[in-house]
Every structure is written in structure tokens, then in C-alpha cells.
Amino acid sequence: MTQQPLRGVTSLRFNQDQSCFCCAMETGVRIYNVEPLMEKGHLDHEQVGSMGLVEMLHRSNLLALVGGGSSPKFSEISVLIWDDAREGKDSKEKLVLEFTFTKPVLSVRMRHDKIVIVLKNRIYVYSFPDNPRKLFEFDTRDNPKGLCDLCPSLEKQLLVFPGHKCGSLQLVDLASTKPGTSSAPFTINAHQSDIACVSLNQPGTVVASASQKGTLIRLFDTQSKEKLVELRRGTDPATLYCINFSHDSSFLCASSDKGTVHIFALKDTRLNRRSALARVGKVGPMIGQYVDSQWSLASFTVPAESACICAFGRNTSKNVNSVIAICVDGTFHKYVFTPDGNCNREAFDVYLDICDDDDF
């Protein structure tokens, strides 16, 4: 997720299991552990310049870097792989790979054996990290946010991104698609307007998406392509910044420019709120769609002017779950919620004020 910088933050990303997050900044890069919140390391401006994008590979020593901001050292058309395990104090010695294109890189995704690089109208997939070679490239409709998601599971190599048709999703099984071919990916007609946010659950069995309208989140089975459930964020349009599943796919959270993080139940959807009209009986088709939607089980607010990413924390007990929100204004929010919809703040911090003297 990227936004105009507040306090120098240009983008934020969780790692693949949401146990860490990385922060691209005007002053370099910072890496944080989520629970407990602590800085794990940083790359300063002298080493990397101002950064536009950073992507982690789990909790490993590898980072993908894309230059950006007001004083970049690296180009916005290149992805550089930083290996902190490499000996040497010179930053050049730690830059072990470079992927260069003719247009700006909008996002990067990594898994243990592949790296995905997203441009405005094209997606590239390479083997990674040893002896990288291009495996696939896919043309897309205009994708200015660089939307895509990559399943981290060892069992499923699923890639999802906006399809050619407005509001559609394309799913590609990278394990069964032959490298060098342009076999047609599976398509899901998810929305009527352009896709604004997309996310896979950890095993890659469910994909969630929202359109630019931002009122509905729809979930689909990645195998059958059938719609599983429709979740209603609200009635007024909003820009969704982030959608994430809990580790066991029992819950889903979503953040938007309304300054609200919504939490939905997926395993037991009876926990979600329903429209009062649902008890009225038969209604017309347009109202019927509204009535059938499920509203969030719980929600909490963060500063509305500050974009944020959200994810689920570690469970503290069987009936208590938590959601973490990381905002570009430098704030960290942790809320706990129960199945009956109670939601309370458990922790607040300013992660930009947490410093560690060690480099990454």
C-alpha cells in the first residue's frame, strides 16, 4: 500500500505471515516485528536513498527494494534484491540481484521460489532467488496500483491479478502453467467496476476482492470459481487500502479511507450483522441484494486521513482475537475482539519513534 508520505512513509507492507512489516521511507527502510512491536533493523538514507517500495521474504535476509520518494538512490524502473547476510559494509556488496524494466515498478511479491514484479500493464514472474530466469509474463488492463497477490503456501503456487475485463480477476496456477507459454488464466467476474483491492488466504483456497466503489467485498473459491459470500463494508463509496485473512481463514479484516477497520466472520457467518430488513420478508431484487449482504461483526477507527494496512495478531485465547493496524502516519493500533462483536483497544504506539541502533 502506498500513499503520499506523512512523516516520510511512502509505503507499508506486511511479510507473508504478517509477523513483520516493512516501511519504505524518505529516509530509507525500516523493518519491524509486530508482536511484540520492535524494530528489527533498518537501512539508512546513505545506504539506499529514499525508497518507494519494500517487500520482505518471510523473515529472511532478503529484501526487494524499489527507489522512490524525493531523493532516490535507485531507479523506480528497477527491483534490487538486498541480501543482508552478505559480508561487507559497502551497500553495493549487499545488492545481489537487479531486475530492470522500461516502466515504473508498481509492486513486488515474493515466495520461497518465485518473485513477481508488477508494472502498469504487465506482470513478470521469475524463478528466485538462485539463478533467476523469466518464467511468465502476463498482459493486464491498466493496473495503476500494481494490484496482485501471490500465495505463499508450499502446496499452492497461485497468482491473482486484475483481468482484462473491467471488474474481473485472473487466477494463474504457476505450478501447472508451462513456462514460456501464454495459456489463458482462469477468470472470475467479481465486480462491475475496476478492482481496487485483492487478497488470497494463506492456503490459496479463497480470494477476496473489492471494487473501486468499495462498498462490497466478495469472496470466491479459487478452485470452483464460485462466489462464497458477500460482505458489506458500508453504503457510501470508499477506497479500500487492505484486505487480509486470519491465519485459519476464520475472519477477514479490511481498511479504507473512511478511517475504519472492519472485521468479518468467515467460518461462522452467523456472527456477522445483518440488515434489519432481512427480517421483513420478501423484498425487491435491488433491496434484496442489500439485505442479503453481511455486515461486519466488529470495527474500530484509526485516523481517517492516514492510510493503513491491517492484519490479524496472535490469538490470546479461544474466544479473543486481535487485529493490528499500521498507519502511514507512524501509528500502531492493536484491537481485540470477541465473537459477540465487542472490540477494544489493547495497544497503541508510534512505531516511527521506536529506534534500533543496528542496521538490518
Curated annotation (Swiss-Prot):
Inhibition and activation profile: Activated upon amino-acid starvation.
- Impact noted for substituting K114A: No effect on interaction with ATG2A
Tell me what happens on changing D113A: Loss of interaction with AMPK. No effect on interaction with ATG2A
Q: InterPro entries under this entry?
A: PROPPIN, WD40/YVTN_repeat-like_dom_sf, WD40_repeat_dom_sf, WD40_rpt
What changing A208D does, per the record, is:
In NBIA5; uncertain significance
Location of the protein in the cell = Preautophagosomal structure; Cytoplasm
Pfam families from the entry?
PROPPIN
Which parts are the WD repeats? Answer: 1-34, 40-84, 92-128, 133-174, 183-222, 227-266, 284-329
Q: Which tissues carry this protein?
A: Ubiquitously expressed, with high expression in skeletal muscle and heart. Weakly expressed in liver and placenta. Expression is down-regulated in pancreatic and in kidney tumors.
Short motif (L/FRRG motif): ranges:
231-234
Offer a single GO CC term for the protein. Answer: cytosol
Q: Name one GO biological process term.
A: positive regulation of autophagosome assembly
Kindly state which keywords UniProt assigns to this record, in alphabetical order: Autophagy, Cytoplasm, Disease variant, Lipid-binding, Neurodegeneration, Repeat, WD repeat
Q: Which residues form a coiled coil?
A: none
Q: What is the effect of changing H112A?
A: No effect on interaction with ATG2A
One MF term in the entry's GO annotations: phosphatidylinositol-3,5-bisphosphate binding
Q: What is the effect of changing E55A?
A: No effect on interaction with ATG2A
- The positions making up the signal sequence are none
Domain characteristics, as noted in the entry: The L/FRRG motif is required for recruitment to PtdIns3P.
Disease tied to this entry? Neurodegeneration with brain iron accumulation 5: A neurodegenerative disorder associated with iron accumulation in the brain, primarily in the basal ganglia. NBIA5 is characterized by global developmental delay in early childhood that is essentially static, with slow motor and cognitive gains until adolescence or early adulthood. In young adulthood, affected individuals develop progressive dystonia, parkinsonism, extrapyramidal signs, and dementia resulting in severe disability.
Name the protein family. Belongs to the WD repeat PROPPIN family.
Oligomer status and interactors: Interacts with WIPI1. Interacts with WIPI2. Interacts with ATG2A and ATG2B. Interacts with ULK1. May interact with the PRKAA1, PRKAA2, PRKAB1 and PRKAG1 subunits of the AMPK kinase. May interact with NUDC.
Role played: Component of the autophagy machinery that controls the major intracellular degradation process by which cytoplasmic materials are packaged into autophagosomes and delivered to lysosomes for degradation. Binds phosphatidylinositol 3-phosphate (PtdIns3P). Activated by the STK11/AMPK signaling pathway upon starvation, WDR45 is involved in autophagosome assembly downstream of WIPI2, regulating the size of forming autophagosomes.
State the protein's name.
Answer: WD repeat domain phosphoinositide-interacting protein 4
**What organism does the UniProt record list as the source?**
Homo sapiens (Human)
The major lineage groups are: Eukaryota, Metazoa, Chordata, Craniata, Vertebrata
Gene name of this polypeptide: WDR45
